[in-house]
Amino acid sequence: MRYKIVIEYDGSDFIGWQKQNHNSNSIQEILEKAIFKFSKQHVIVYGAGRTDAGVHALGQVAHFDLTTDFETYIVRNAINYHLISHAIAVVHVEKTDTDFHARFSAKRRYYLYKIVNRYSPLTIDRNRAWLVHTPLNVENMIKAVCYIKGNHNFSSFRAKCCQSKSPIKTVDNLSITYNHPYIDINISAISFLHHQVRIIVGTLVECGKGYFPPEHIKTIMEANNRSYAGTTAPSYGLYFVKVDYS
């Protein structure tokens, strides 16, 4: 039986989603251990997005297979019981067809990046938003968005260690909302390059600081060179919001 789960987590204390040989503090491995504790079955949990260390999730989707047909509420409650000491929660469980794959069946992924633009330090939003002291010209940031949306070669916006075969991606939506001092950047695509969202955010912030005009984003894009784009925004401001499968 294949189970599809929706997961929420605070990424602050984890090395990221994916298991690593030298470290057991990944969200994937912690979930697999929790599932084993109640089912006594070794499973592999496949996630829709392999979030980096510090990145949070409001609606990460994953799947795994069990030989036992449990009621979905039992699966949810049992996993959460064994996650009680971790900042991870399963918020929804459903049974699904065996041809469903959390990663490869995804049609669109949605991310949110949170910025707080003020001089005072953060308290409630500490490790949950990027504190930018310099006053930002949000209007210019919004103007720059049009040069990023659409189908492009995003070589300037990918990490050097990115293993994706192609730098061509389509950003379906990119929008900025501003309610001083809070700036929310929402972005969606079928898939993203490694660090693509965080580099886009870092570049938009540099535009907002006045380092270059909005139209310079086009030059950055056409350069196909990582050194032309802005800094990589911190991981702790990024949230994996949800995944569409239809």
UniProtKB/Swiss-Prot annotation:
Keyword line: Isomerase, tRNA processing
GO biological process, one term: tRNA pseudouridine synthesis
Name this polypeptide is given: tRNA pseudouridine synthase A
Active site: 52
Subunit structure: Homodimer.
Binding site for substrate: 111
InterPro entries: PsdUridine_synth_cat_dom_sf, PsdUridine_synth_TruA, PsdUridine_synth_TruA_a/b_dom, PsdUridine_synth_TruA_C, TruA/RsuA/RluB/E/F_N
EC number: 5.4.99.12
Lineage of origin: Bacteria, Pseudomonadati, Pseudomonadota, Alphaproteobacteria, Rickettsiales
Reaction(s) this enzyme catalyzes, per UniProt: uridine(38/39/40) in tRNA = pseudouridine(38/39/40) in tRNA
Entry's family note: Belongs to the tRNA pseudouridine synthase TruA family.
EC supergroup of this enzyme: isomerase
GO molecular function, one term: RNA binding
Protein function: Formation of pseudouridine at positions 38, 39 and 40 in the anticodon stem and loop of transfer RNAs.
Matching Gene3D superfamilies: Pseudouridine synthase I, catalytic domain, C-terminal subdomain, Pseudouridine synthase I, catalytic domain, N-terminal subdomain
